[in-house]
């Protein structure tokens, strides 16, 4: 049956995917012929996710390695699965409930809401799995894992064979808690007021917005004054005045209510006279105005603003560090919704306590935490409403720093100098862009918040993770990733692992009263199950105390239930206890940090753990090097004392063709499924591979994808040519490279070229140079095979020499098969289709044996020299004709003035071929090159084309000079921009890079024009 003229990717991809699945082609260990294993863990996409270009790129690289190793006989496992994506999934389900007018999360309650989440996951959670299959991802889909598998309510939909991941997560938490590696404490976290939960740094988007910086005066206590002196760089006094205040600048005036100190740099001489003294916070009821100390710390920059910084340790990460160093109280101002706190005693009483602490009275963390320093009239207000009122109150009292109305720092509100009112005195409120943290899902401003959370004591587990990279046990590619890795881990902070959500692994801790301090504090019982927690509690409280479980509040607010009896002396004795479970869940990064062992069945002693762990390589983005990669390193080493993988390959973000980040806002998002629909999966995959330079910028363009779609067409046509020339008939034997032994130079040459490219591809993939592998295959298949071998073989295939015909068919059959085999890891669909169409095969291409032949055994030097000579003559002749714009179909004479024996022999054996492909009608020998010829270079020979009578030299020269003049203007403009430091420093990176690329392209064009003009000069 003859091949179709074109490849129908849409029809073939679905059919081939089904055939692979039915054959179990991707199962762990499929096609195994050796003991070595190759394991790769998919970075689990969110269960809420849909395929984007980042997924498509990342999974293409993983699939290339997986298919390559599987064809080489490795015991191969590509482990798929999905992350339960706590906050994202909870948000999606809450949206669904609202859209369908169902009861809200709060109305449903925790248990019923989680049922809804599992239902949603069963209905929509498999979307990205099907999308990855469309890409050709050869994961063992029968092993699809899920990071919440085995948790309460799991119906096992979509992850039927997943190991019990939940039990593994809980066991690790309990074990680490018992080893003192996990603790509950109060620290500053990123708080999302919309979702009312802590979030990770990765879930925070820092966006530049138009902001303001207010300048305020903090009066010195008791009306004290000091001499304020400013000096220039040479030490000359430029300002000297008496002041009774210290000025600060802030972008968040509402947080002034929680100030614990004002800090200045130890070397800042301006404030030396008042260090250690008290100043007054300029907000709140005057009669209860708080005073705070002026301290020194290395944090303030004396050259920025006034050099003095307010320290609000409970609402700023930098201030938190200063407060911790200086023993400054951390006053919490807001509730979980981002509103000013409304709890606690009246402001007057609370301010009095805080004043005592500022004057040196000792305090505990709990004593500080309950104090509410929000004035009564501001309590319950939204934080931004409170900001406006604080600014108004300070300004009304005359404690704002003032300036003239023409001060340019005022931004667009500044009046022009000399304008009416320009000299008026107004509050100094700088208009300036500021980086504002937003929740990536809620889109609300994130608040640094001091809350009780669970933490991993990262300092205790980071050492082995650092050592594993330092000693080479784990290699990070590119090497620049190692520096980033060291930076993060050498400066590691406690890792917040709790989230105030319902969807996730609920923290396995139950609380009861502290038997030694009833009603004042908790006793925590960490256990893998309720039964284990009960045993711990019974052992703690004793046999005389009845212990049961309370369903518990949805937020732990101190409502621990217990009963007592009073003894004869009035002492209280515990009689009953109801344990309450911690309502928080674990951060998804904690569970995904166990992805390698959790998916292989740990803590059970499984065959998979023995065969596939540690894994071979992890392919992931630079952006989660710390959040996921480093934490997997720490977790696996802490839990099983082994590294999770031997190599980490990091890649950049996939950007658009101009290097810009893709976003819906800018409208430059490329949907990979739309690309697959339009161009086929193979074109997208080859594009991904070709741009995967180690550490390189990833620019995806439809133009590039179109080019590789054309490559699939070229391959199809080459195989179709071979089929039409009876290459794949039963009469043509399927021989190995060693068995072919052809006589024709062209056949010996292409066998050697095939061996060379096999070695190039293996070397490239072995060192993760995916782009080099793709580019080598492209150059070989399109350039060597399609452009040259197919053309050079035509005289042999269509001639009357039956022996030459037979050897050429056998050679071409082998070469075409090798093209399919070598291309398969990158372009699996079209190669599998052609493999099946061209012959009866013992097995599918996905399980074909990867070749091991060597160039040293197959390269024929004589054939190489001859065919490379022939190709150079044809290529150089074609290039000269194109430059001189000789009509494509016109045959022209050629002159030769010298040629060595090798060249003459090559010409004699290939004359007809050279003349046909170079459009030469005759070859004439001459002692010297006649006037009007352009030279054609060839090894050991000097050829020329007499073109003076064929082209209009004058018109052609004018055309080229005109083009060169136009180009010179473009080059001048580009060079001017790139030589301008302001442009290079201030323009967006992608704009500068685009200008550099344009300059390089124009310079290449200039070189071509100069070459063409030089050739014209030869013609006279």
UniProtKB/Swiss-Prot annotation:
Transmembrane segments: none annotated. Its main location: cytoplasm. PROSITE patterns: AA_TRNA_LIGASE_I (PS00178). A motif ('HIGH' region) lies at residues 45-55. One of its GO terms (molecular function) is valine-tRNA ligase activity. It is an enzyme of class 6 (ligase). InterPro entries: aa-tRNA-synth_I_CS, aa-tRNA-synth_Ia, Anticodon_Ia_Val, M/V/L/I-tRNA-synth_anticd-bd, Rossmann-like_a/b/a_fold, tRNA-bd_arm, tRNAsynth_Ia_anticodon-bd, Val-tRNA_synth_C_sf. Keywords: Aminoacyl-tRNA synthetase, ATP-binding, Coiled coil, Cytoplasm, Ligase, Nucleotide-binding, Protein biosynthesis. It comes from the Bacteria. Residues 955-1020 form a coiled coil. Its EC number is 6.1.1.9. GO terms for cellular component: cytosol. A motif ('KMSKS' region) lies at residues 661-665. It is found in: Cytoplasm. ATP binds at residue 664. It catalyses: tRNA(Val) + L-valine + ATP = L-valyl-tRNA(Val) + AMP + diphosphate. Catalyzes the attachment of valine to tRNA(Val). As ValRS can inadvertently accommodate and process structurally similar amino acids such as threonine, to avoid such errors, it has a 'posttransfer' editing activity that hydrolyzes mischarged Thr-tRNA(Val) in a tRNA-dependent manner. ValRS has two distinct active sites: one for aminoacylation and one for editing. The misactivated threonine is translocated from the active site to the editing site. The C-terminal coiled-coil domain is crucial for aminoacylation activity. This is Valine--tRNA ligase. The gene is valS.
């Amino acid at each position: 049956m003859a091949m179709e003229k074109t490849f129908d990717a849409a029809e073939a991809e679905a059919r081939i995917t089904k055939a692979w699945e039915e054959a179990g082609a991707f199962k762990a260990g499929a096609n195994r012929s050796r003991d070595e294993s190759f394991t790769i863990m998919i970075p689990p996409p969110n269960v809420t996710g849909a395929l984007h270009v980042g997924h498509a790129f990342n999974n293409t690289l993983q699939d290339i390695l997986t298919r390559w190793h599987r064809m080489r006989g490795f015991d191969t496992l590509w482990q798929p699965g999905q992350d339960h994506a706590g906050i994202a999934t909870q948000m999606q389900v809450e949206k669904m409930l609202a859209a369908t007018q169902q009861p809200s999360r709060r109305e449903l309650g925790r248990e019923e809401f989680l049922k809804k989440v599992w239902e949603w996951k069963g209905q929509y959670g498999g979307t990205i799995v099907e999308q990855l299959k469309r890409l050709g991802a050869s994961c063992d889909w029968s092993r699809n894992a899920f990071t919440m598998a085995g948790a309460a309510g799991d119906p096992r939909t979509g992850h039927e064979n997943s190991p019990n991941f939940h039990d593994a997560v809980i066991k690790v938490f309990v074990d680490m808690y018992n080893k003192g590696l996990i603790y509950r404490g109060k620290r500053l976290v990123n708080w999302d007021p919309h979702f009312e939960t802590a979030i990770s740094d990765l879930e925070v988007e820092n966006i530049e917005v138009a902001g303001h910086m207010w300048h305020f005066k903090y009066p010195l206590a008791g009306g004290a004054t000091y001499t304020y002196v400013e000096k220039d760089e040479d030490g000359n006094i430029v300002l000297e005045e008496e002041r009774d205040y210290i000025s600060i600048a802030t972008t968040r005036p509402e947080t002034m209510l929680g100030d614990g100190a004002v800090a200045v740099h130890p070397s800042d001489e301006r404030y030396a006279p008042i260090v250690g003294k008290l100043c007054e916070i300029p907000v709140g009821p005057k009669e209860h105005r708080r005073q705070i100390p002026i301290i020194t710390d290395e944090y303030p920059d004396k050259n920025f603003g006034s050099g003095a910084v307010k320290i609000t340790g409970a609402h700023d990460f930098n201030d938190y560090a200063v407060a911790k160093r200086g023993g400054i109280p951390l006053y919490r101002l807001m509730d979980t919704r981002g509103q000013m706190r409304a709890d606690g005693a009246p402001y007057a009483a609370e301010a009095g306590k805080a004043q005592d602490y500022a004057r040196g009275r000792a305090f505990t963390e709990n004593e500080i935490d309950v104090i509410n320093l929000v004035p009564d009239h501001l309590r319950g207000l939204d934080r931004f409403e409170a900001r406006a009122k604080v600014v108004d109150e300070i300004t009304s009292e005359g404690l704002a720093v003032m300036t003239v109305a023409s001060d340019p720092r005022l931004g667009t509100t500044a009046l022009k100098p000399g304008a009416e009112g320009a000299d008026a005195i107004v509050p100094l409120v700088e208009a300036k862009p500021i980086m504002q943290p937003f929740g990536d899902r809620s889109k609300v401003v994130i608040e640094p918040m001091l809350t009780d959370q669970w933490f991993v004591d990262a300092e205790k587990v980071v050492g082995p993770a650092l050592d594993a990279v330092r000693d080479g046990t784990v290699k990070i590619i590119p090497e620049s990733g190692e520096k980033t890795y060291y930076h993060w881990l050498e400066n590691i902070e406690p890792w917040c692992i709790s989230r105030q959500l319902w969807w996730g692994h609920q923290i396995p801790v139950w609380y009861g009263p502290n038997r030694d301090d009833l009603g004042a504090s908790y006793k925590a019982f960490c256990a893998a199950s309720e039964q284990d927690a009960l045993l711990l509690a019974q052992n703690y409280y004793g046999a005389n105390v009845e212990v049961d479980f309370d369903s518990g509040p949805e937020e732990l607010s101190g409502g621990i239930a217990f009963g007592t009896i009073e003894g004869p002396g009035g002492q209280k004795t515990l009689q009953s206890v109801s344990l309450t479970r911690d309502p928080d869940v674990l951060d998804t990064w904690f569970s995904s940090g166990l992805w390698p062992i959790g998916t292989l069945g740990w803590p059970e002693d499984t065959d998979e753990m023995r065969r596939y762990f540690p894994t071979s390589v992890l392919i992931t983005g630079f952006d989660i090097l710390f959040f996921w990669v480093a934490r997997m390193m720490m977790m696996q080493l802490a839990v099983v004392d082994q590294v999770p993988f031997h190599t980490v390959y990091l890649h950049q973000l996939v950007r658009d063709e101009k290097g810009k980040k893709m976003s819906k806002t800018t409208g430059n998002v490329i949907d990979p499924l739309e690309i697959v629909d339009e161009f086929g999966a193979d074109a997208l995959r080859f594009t991904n591979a070709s741009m995967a330079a180690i550490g390189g910028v990833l620019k995806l363009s439809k133009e590039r994808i179109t080019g590789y779609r054309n490559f699939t067409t070229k391959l199809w046509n080459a195989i179709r040519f071979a089929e039409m020339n009876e290459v794949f008939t039963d009469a043509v034997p399927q021989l190995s490279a060693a068995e072919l032994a052809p006589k024709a130079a062209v056949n010996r040459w292409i066998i050697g070229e095939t061996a060379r490219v096999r070695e190039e591809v293996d070397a490239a993939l072995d060192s993760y140079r995916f782009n080099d592998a793709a580019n080598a295959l492209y150059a070989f298949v399109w350039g060597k095979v399609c452009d040259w071998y197919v053309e050079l073989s035509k005289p042999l295939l269509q001639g009357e020499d039956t022996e030459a015909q037979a050897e050429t068919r056998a050679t071409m059959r082998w070469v075409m098969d090798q093209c399919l085999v070598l291309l398969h890891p990158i372009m699996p669909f079209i190669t599998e289709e052609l493999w099946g169409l061209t012959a009866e095969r013992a097995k599918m291409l996905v399980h074909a044996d990867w070749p091991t032949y060597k160039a040293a055994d197959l390269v024929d030097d004589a054939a190489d020299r001859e065919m490379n000579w022939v190709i150079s003559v044809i290529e150089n002749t074609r290039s000269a004709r194109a430059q001189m714009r000789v009509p494509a179909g016109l045959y022209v004479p050629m002159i030769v003035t010298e040629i060595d024996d090798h060249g003459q022999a090559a010409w004699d054996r290939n004359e007809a071929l050279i003349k046909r492909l170079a459009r030469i009608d005759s070859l004439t020998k001459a002692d010297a090159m006649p006037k009007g010829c352009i030279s054609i270079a060839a090894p050991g020979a000097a050829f020329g084309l007499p073109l003076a009578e064929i082209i209009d030299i004058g018109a052609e020269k004018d055309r080229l000079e005109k083009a060169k003049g136009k180009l010179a203007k473009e080059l001048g403009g580009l060079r001017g921009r790139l030589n301008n430091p302001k442009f290079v420093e201030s323009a967006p990176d992608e704009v500068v890079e685009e200008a550099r690329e344009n300059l390089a392209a124009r310079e290449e064009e200039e070189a071509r024009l100069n070459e063409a003009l030089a050739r014209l000069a030869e013609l006279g």
